Every structure is written in structure tokens, then in C-alpha cells.
Amino acid sequence: MDLSIRRMRKEDLDWLYRLLSDPEVMRWLEPLYSREQAETFLFCAGLSESPLIYAAEEQGVPIGYVIDHPYDEHSREIGWVLLPEYWGRGYASALTDLLIQRAGQERR
């Protein structure tokens, strides 16, 4: 696996909308998003000065997003939401490892 995590970009709206409007993906999360709601989510959670979400990529191709932000002074919230074609292939575990490494680097 060649995974990376990067800041979200405006150009991410198409795949983010596909993710957030997929009934299988959103089954246990929020109601399905409209394109306008996905755009608002991108700008508020991904493009803000202190983002809550980041794009997850495999060899430069977006596969979903990760959640990574301080929860309080002693803990952080981490998580992931992946496109269905990447489910069951070990990406969530690998992304969790990346997020833990990232958190450790920030503590130094």
C-alpha cells in the first residue's frame, strides 16, 4: 500500500459527494448528503484553518477521508470514511497506523 493523507482541496468535491451520497457508506452515519451539503461539509470541515478531515489517498488517488483533530487537551478523535471499493482490503487499519504516527509526530 502506498497511502498518504493530505489537506482537502476544492477539487475534492466530486469524489466527496459520491462518498457522502452513497447509501451503503452513509448507512450508519448521517442522512445522505446533497451536492450542496457535501460542498458545505468540504468547506467547513476540510478547508477551514483548522480542518477536521483530510483526504486519504492510495498512490495519489482519493479513497476517502480521515478524521483527525484534537478532542480535548489529552485526546484526539480519529476515524475514516472510505469509498466502498476500498472496503475489506486493510485500508482502515493502515490509515489508523498513519494517524497514530502523525499524532506521535505532533506531540514531539
PLM regions and their residue ranges:
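Conserved acetyl-CoA-binding loop-helix of GNAT-fold acetyltransferases
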Residues: G88-A103
